[in-house]
């Protein structure tokens, strides 16, 4: 069944959209797109996610986004020279006959590339450093932030993601995106995000998305999230 999608929006002029977002130091290449290895064993995140879910999620779902993206770009040399981020920021420049394919699969590739990095078997606990201070300033305290983040993830109807972003005004904001849309499509820099597609949690949690959302905090990689927050902040300061 096809999924109705809202039209892609051209991002507003924003310092946050000119920086890579898959990695803090380099853009995500499309020539060709490649599946990144997991930075830990598939069973390493068992505090929140079982090994079989991780293997299926990474080896099958993420690989499918990569394969579909490369197929769509096979006869598009001009697009192959762009980063994934650049394509998603300006979807109107993508030929109409492959626009939704690029939106879904480039988005899926980007989202999951971020997702694997912001989790760690040594993660969890309270945030520290600059991101902790920013969360406290914006949301009052970490518990308030976590509650709002989980509520946004729980309220996402169907498939999608919940994100903490730095918006065009330099403020932290919780947003939810449908399907495989990424916050850069609206001019926001994704600091962290959780996948609320059923394939991310169903083997272990079935329909208990709230339990998954709660347990996920046990593997959140605050060191990487601090790196991402600082990268967004530095880019904004230079602009």
UniProtKB/Swiss-Prot annotation:
<dbReference type="Pfam" id="PF00081">
    <property type="entry name" value="Sod_Fe_N"/>
</dbReference>
<comment type="similarity">
    <text>Belongs to the iron/manganese superoxide dismutase family.</text>
</comment>
<dbReference type="Pfam" id="PF02777">
    <property type="entry name" value="Sod_Fe_C"/>
</dbReference>
<dbReference type="InterPro" id="IPR019831">
    <property type="entry name" value="Mn/Fe_SOD_N"/>
</dbReference>
<keyword id="KW-0560">Oxidoreductase</keyword>
<comment type="subunit">
    <text>Homodimer.</text>
</comment>
<dbReference type="InterPro" id="IPR001189">
    <property type="entry name" value="Mn/Fe_SOD"/>
</dbReference>
<dbReference type="InterPro" id="IPR036314">
    <property type="entry name" value="SOD_C_sf"/>
</dbReference>
<dbReference type="InterPro" id="IPR019833">
    <property type="entry name" value="Mn/Fe_SOD_BS"/>
</dbReference>
<keyword id="KW-0464">Manganese</keyword>
<feature type="binding site">
    <location>
        <position position="199"/>
    </location>
    <ligand>
        <name>Mn(2+)</name>
    </ligand>
</feature>
<dbReference type="GO" id="GO:0005737">
    <property type="term" value="C:cytoplasm"/>
</dbReference>
<feature type="compositionally biased region" description="Polar residues">
    <location>
        <begin position="1"/>
        <end position="19"/>
    </location>
</feature>
<keyword id="KW-0479">Metal-binding</keyword>
<feature type="region of interest" description="Disordered">
    <location>
        <begin position="1"/>
        <end position="20"/>
    </location>
</feature>
<dbReference type="InterPro" id="IPR019832">
    <property type="entry name" value="Mn/Fe_SOD_C"/>
</dbReference>
<dbReference type="InterPro" id="IPR036324">
    <property type="entry name" value="Mn/Fe_SOD_N_sf"/>
</dbReference>
<protein>
    <recommendedName>
        <fullName>Superoxide dismutase [Mn] 3</fullName>
        <ecNumber>1.15.1.1</ecNumber>
    </recommendedName>
</protein>
<feature type="signal peptide">
    <location>
        <begin position="1"/>
        <end position="30"/>
    </location>
</feature>
<dbReference type="GO" id="GO:0046872">
    <property type="term" value="F:metal ion binding"/>
</dbReference>
<feature type="binding site">
    <location>
        <position position="112"/>
    </location>
    <ligand>
        <name>Mn(2+)</name>
    </ligand>
</feature>
<feature type="binding site">
    <location>
        <position position="195"/>
    </location>
    <ligand>
        <name>Mn(2+)</name>
    </ligand>
</feature>
<keyword id="KW-0732">Signal</keyword>
<feature type="binding site">
    <location>
        <position position="57"/>
    </location>
    <ligand>
        <name>Mn(2+)</name>
    </ligand>
</feature>
<comment type="function">
    <text>Destroys superoxide anion radicals which are normally produced within the cells and which are toxic to biological systems.</text>
</comment>
<dbReference type="GO" id="GO:0004784">
    <property type="term" value="F:superoxide dismutase activity"/>
</dbReference>
